Curated annotation (Swiss-Prot):
This is Hemoglobin subunit beta. GO terms for biological process: hydrogen peroxide catabolic process. Heterotetramer of two alpha chains and two beta chains. Belongs to the globin family. SUPFAM superfamilies: Globin-like. Coiled coil: none annotated. One of its GO terms (molecular function) is organic acid binding. One of its GO terms (cellular component) is blood microparticle. InterPro entries: Globin, Globin-like_sf, Globin/Proto, Hemoglobin_b, Hemoglobin_oxygen_transport. Residues 2-146 form the Globin domain.
């Protein structure tokens, strides 16, 4: 994947302002609420019976932070995202058997969360760069499935 200097700047500039714990928890919670069938991968998380339960679930919050923290590795390694996520791809494919479509869904939700948090700063150009990034990350995570 080729990144322009502008795309790199838009991604890293916004990433520097992201509250990883808050945005990560919100993104994962939204995934579980908007696409409830994804909850089957999180049966060990306890009560996911309602949006309120999901939003208040400490395991959702902790895992959301973990997910977005690892997403930060993509931001730091834009030119080697496939390598950066090869172990996570193996884990999610071989051990967890996660449907790779869920990576795309989570990426799209992350874009929604960033738009909600950053408003006018999340310009169409910024959105395009982030949409490209989440697509590349989803593809890297799905790599072991192919």
């Amino acid at each position: 994947v080729q990144w322009t200097a502008e795309e790199k700047q838009l991604i890293t500039g916004l990433w520097g302002k992201v509250n990883v714990a808050e945005c990560g928890a919100e993104a994962l919670a939204r995934l579980l609420i908007v696409y409830p069938w994804t909850q089957r991968f999180f049966a060990s998380f306890g009560n996911l019976s309602s949006p309120t339960a999901v939003l208040g679930n400490p395991k959702v919050q902790a895992h959301g932070k973990k997910v977005l923290t690892s997403f930060g590795d993509a931001v730091k390694n834009l030119d080697s995202i496939k390598n950066t996520f090869s172990q996570l791809s193996e884990l999610h494919c071989d051990k967890l058997h996660v449907d790779p479509e869920n990576f795309r869904l989570l990426g799209d939700i992350l874009v929604v969360v960033l738009a909600a948090h950053f408003g006018k700063d999340f310009t169409p150009d910024c959105q395009a760069a982030w949409q490209k990034l989440v697509r590349v990350v989803a593809h890297a995570l799905a790599r072991k499935y192919h």
